[in-house]
């Protein structure tokens, strides 16, 4: 019997790419990577719309890295 790549399970990646959205309500967002096993990110980052540092929260997973 010949084994092909179809029969082997894929391993999950260690990091994922996530979208961070501003809590100031400006709609500004950026992408960053985080460890898969870590909880959802919340961080202070510069928002150019309001020209100050505001809270950003993780809204959705974009892809595996």
UniProtKB/Swiss-Prot annotation:
Cellular compartment(s): Mitochondrion
Keyword Ribonucleoprotein: yes
UniProt superkingdom: Eukaryota
GO biological process, one term: mitochondrial translation
Family to which the UniProt record says this protein belongs: Belongs to the bacterial ribosomal protein bL33 family.
PANTHER family assigned: 39S RIBOSOMAL PROTEIN L33, MITOCHONDRIAL, LARGE RIBOSOMAL SUBUNIT PROTEIN BL33M
Name recorded for this polypeptide: Large ribosomal subunit protein bL33m
Gene (UniProt): MRPL33
